[in-house]
Amino acid sequence: MPTVFPDDSVGLVSPQTLHFNEPLELTSGKSLAEYDLVIETYGELNATQSNAVLICHALSGHHHAAGYHSVDERKPGWWDSCIGPGKPIDTRKFFVVALNNLGGCNGSSGPASINPATGKVYGADFPMVTVEDWVHSQARLADRLGIRQWAAVVGGSLGGMQALQWTISYPERVRHCLCIASAPKLSAQNIAFNEVARQAILSDPEFLGGYFQEQGVIPKRGLKLARMVGHITYLSDDAMGAKFGRVLKTEKLNYDLHSVEFQVESYLRYQGEEFSTRFDANTYLLMTKALDYFDPAAAHGDDLVRTLEGVEADFCLMSFTTDWRFSPARSREIVDALIAAKKNVSYLEIDAPQGHDAFLMPIPRYLQAFSGYMNRISV
């Protein structure tokens, strides 16, 4: 834990909760009569409101993207390597907004929050929200903050999908889009992985149809398995081999069906256990479904070029060589469509062994390229 924060840290930060009374119509046909969004901001909004950057989070992300909530906090925000003075998203230049999306479980309205109409936890009654719904709620957030146009909307993985959707839904409100380790839609394999994770949760006896909180229980077993499956897909084979290989946790093989004998087994169990103590099962179901549903070209005859013809932003896409969850080929689909639509786009495929999670890591070539693009943005 830090006693003195590094010079390139945003330091101590405090989340804010913003309440919205105007009903939000959702893609599903349902609506939220009112809702909360929890945000953090870093840096200062300039006089012309031209330096604002929106950070969109991935599946298990949230509003705490940088800095520390207290001097006792063990780790900084989830993207601290990229946000702060002198970092790619330089808070001396930019006013940065990070939020917890609707349906999340870190303070924004979601399945784990109280339904104001009933006074009870939403649970399974919280309506399905999509990437488009998130973007519409984020646009209202921008209005509340007095931001007419984002200098950039930035995100990795599911966050990159939101950044892309911003340029489609609100083309005049985004000058730059940074879409990292993402895709224009999920492959069948990705949907399959999500379904296995969901079934792990749904088959947990303590899930109770999504109303487990009313009974004071948590479907930890299902959440743990879901996270273990997901975590495997976030790492590359090379990264897992280098980190664990076939190293034993025990001195020798026990030839026992129930023993945790390999280091990689122990690691996955730890990751699953830790995740199950901090994440909501209904939120996990919702987030994976939002991933599955994302397909902006579907409304344009499955033609991604047509879908992107109306965008006005400049684009930067980055992918990682060993990412097999969202492979470089998926980013190139977006790049090729943007080129065909005669849009400005930069693309970099970064050689990195870490797999999909590379977008979260302080890889020098990645940070250098990220900084290079952000430095070009005028405010």
Curated annotation (Swiss-Prot):
Q: A Pfam family this protein belongs to?
A: Abhydrolase_1
Q: What happens when the gene is disrupted?
A: Methionine auxotroph. Defect is complemented by expression of the E.coli metA gene.
Active site positions, chain numbering: S157 (nucleophile), D323, H356
- Coiled coil feature spans: none
Record-listed substrate binding positions: R227, D357
Protein family membership: Belongs to the AB hydrolase superfamily. MetX family.
Q: How does it assemble?
A: Homodimer.
Q: Sum up the protein's function in the record's words.
A: Transfers a succinyl group from succinyl-CoA to L-homoserine, forming succinyl-L-homoserine.
Q: What is this protein called?
A: Homoserine O-succinyltransferase
- Which organism is the protein's source? Pseudomonas aeruginosa (strain ATCC 15692 / DSM 22644 / CIP 104116 / JCM 14847 / LMG 12228 / 1C / PRS 101 / PAO1)
The gene is metXS
